[in-house]
Regions:
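Substrate-binding clefts and catalytic carboxylate motifs of secreted carbohydrate-active enzymes
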Residues: 104, 140-143, 152-362
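Terminal connector regions
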Residues: 394-439, 492-505
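Active-site-adjacent substrate/metal-binding segments within catalytic domains
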Residues: 1-2, 6-72, 81-103, 231-266
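C-terminal accessory/binding modules appended to enzymatic or scaffolding proteins
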Residues: 437-481, 485-489, 501
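Intrinsically disordered, low-complexity Pro/Gly/Ser/Thr-rich segments with frequent PxxP/GP/PP motifs
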Residues: 369-408, 468-493
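Short acidic, flexible loop segments centered on an aromatic residue
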Residues: 358-376, 455-471
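Active-site neighborhood of glycoside hydrolase catalytic domains
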Residues: 58, 74-164, 306-307, 311
């Protein structure tokens, strides 16, 4: 069976009259652009209009459909029961014919909160009412009106009955120790969930999107009144700063801070998705929170309110690719090394993995190289292998005991039918400690392509135009002192700007 790789769709706008088939199509096209094969309609919003499902049918996007209940408990009075029964019947009958409809889900996070008996639960009857709504009324209606479609009682859930709904070994899991729990990105590697249906990390939207709600220079600060009003999780701008100080040097300008925040988000989700794809079979779903925004805000989305793509969305295009190479490196980040301890020693190694989410076996070549900051090759390796359909395959560990963690990095690439189809780089130290050389980035436009050149290792190269609405075949990519041709999908190619992690200083 196919691994589910997707994220969650929330209402497209706080003013619903602005939403129409054109806006929905543009958003779902962005989902397909990033190689999604499914999408979750989150239960804290509303049931989308028919055109949403028509477009998903057309695009081949499987829909996980929540019923519209989330993060609350309800008193099941006779009047309320009659109301919701009609709601369930009408929506099941309205949507059941869609080829894209893959699953009905009772609610978002309610079983978990009832199980934990948290402060939202005020009286015992609410537990009884929960069972009646989500384990009797809804499944009976789904069985009667849409018996072909699977019903799942809640997300997360282990199958219902308040049986440890967030159990990592059963059902689906919402995992937030990274972000809410302030754990490092490498924490994902400690877990082997069966289906991770929600996890996320915040980032600022594009500067041009921020300028839609303020053009006052004094507001261009993560802790200004305006920025904190456009942040709906209390103190989360400080949380972004906390992760940033662990990872990067202090940005010298607000636009550089925005860029760094987007790289944090992109790398945080990448760590998770790549780990779970490497463990395909044990884990069959990686669903990050969230696709879109309903207003211009600092949030978990990969597409901001104005439709601009954050770095995460380009990363998603790569880590959701049907054929993908990834690297499980061991170094300073994975060991959580404390440089002030007497024994500041840790393993320096890589384990490469190829994930094949296609229906055919793939004959591929894997190449890796240990390089210095100028991208000169110090050591290299190559291996040919066949990766069976719908599997992931590990390569042997390679150790680098003599590597300089501050000056050496590893590049890797996956070649299929003579073309590089997936690639990346890893460091053994935090980016803030790596001795990047100035890559002296340049670019030129040739027809519908931008050719980007670097004279040294360039990490997470960003290409922006003046309006920051340029959509490219690839962006926020790594260069090994070489050049890359990037196809322009839309947007002006005048007044292009380039930067990389070297510029976070």
């Amino acid at each position: 069976s196919e691994m589910c790789i997707r994220d969650s769709y929330i209402p497209e706008d706080n003013l619903l009259g602005r939403v129409n088939p054109e806006t929905t199509r543009k958003l779902l096209e962005k989902a397909k652009f990033a190689n999604y094969n499914a999408i979750r309609v989150w239960g804290g919003g509303y049931y989308p209009s028919d055109w949403f499902y028509d477009i998903c049918d057309e695009m081949g996007l499987m829909v996980w459909q929540d019923f519209m209940f989330a993060c609350a408990v309800y008193e099941l009075t006779p009047e309320f029961e009659a109301n919701i029964r009609q709601e369930f019947i009408e929506n099941v009958k309205r949507l059941r014919h869609h080829a894209s409809l893959g699953l009905w889900c009772g609610n978002n996070e309610m079983e978990q909160f009832v199980f934990e008996r948290n402060s939202w639960l005020t009286k015992p009857s609410e537990v009884k009412d929960y069972f009646l709504m989500f384990e009797r009324i809804i499944p009976e209606i789904v069985h009667e009106y849409d018996p072909q479609t699977f019903y799942w009682p809640a997300s997360p859930s282990s199958g219902g009955c308040l049986d440890e709904p967030n159990d990592p070994n059963r059902g689906d899991v919402h995992y937030w120790k990274v972000w809410h729990g302030n754990r490092p990105f490498t924490e994902y590697r400690k877990y082997f969930f069966r289906y991770l249906s929600e996890f996320g990390f915040q980032a600022f939207p594009s500067v041009k999107t921020i300028e839609q709600f303020t053009d006052n220079e004094e507001d261009m600060n993560p802790f200004s009144y305006i920025m904190e009003k456009h942040q709906r999780q209390y103190s989360a701008n400080g949380k972004i700063m906390g992760y940033m100080q662990q990872t990067y040097k202090y940005p010298n300008s607000f636009p550089t801070f925005v860029y760094a925040s987007q790289l944090l988000q992109a790398d945080g989700i990448r760590y998770g998705v790549e780990h779970f794809r490497r463990n395909r079979g044990r884990c069959m779903g990686a669903v990050y929170w969230q696709l879109n925004d309903c207003w211009p805000v600092i949030s978990w989305s990969s597409v901001d309110y104005c439709g601009r793509l954050k770095a995460l969305h380009y990363y998603a295009k790569r880590f959701f690719a049907p054929l993908m190479i990834s690297c499980e490196e061991q170094g300073m980040m994975s060991s959580e090394a404390n440089m002030n301890r007497e024994h500041f020693v840790f393993e320096k190694s890589i384990r490469l993995n190829v994930a094949n989410e296609t229906m055919q076996d793939q004959n591929v070549t894997v190449r890796w190289a240990l390089r210095d900051p100028g991208a000169a090759v110090l050591e290299s390796g190559e291996q040919e292998l066949t990766v069976p359909a719908l599997t992931s395959t590990w390569l042997d560990k390679v150790e680098f005991p003599d590597a300089d963690i501050f000056s050496h990095y590893v590049s890797y690439e996956l070649i299929c039918d003579g073309k590089v189809v997936s690639e990346g780089t890893v460091n053994f130290s935090y980016p803030k400690y790596f001795r990047y050389e100035d890559p002296e980035l340049t670019c030129r436009v040739e027809g519908d392509e931008i050719v980007v050149s670097a004279k040294a290792y360039a990490k997470s190269v960003e290409i922006l135009n003046e309006n920051e609405d340029l959509v490219l075949e690839d962006n926020y990519f790594d260069l090994n002192a070489n050049e890359k041709r990037v196809k322009v999908i839309s947007g002006s190619t005048e007044n292009l700007r380039l930067r990389s992690v070297y510029d976070i200083r």
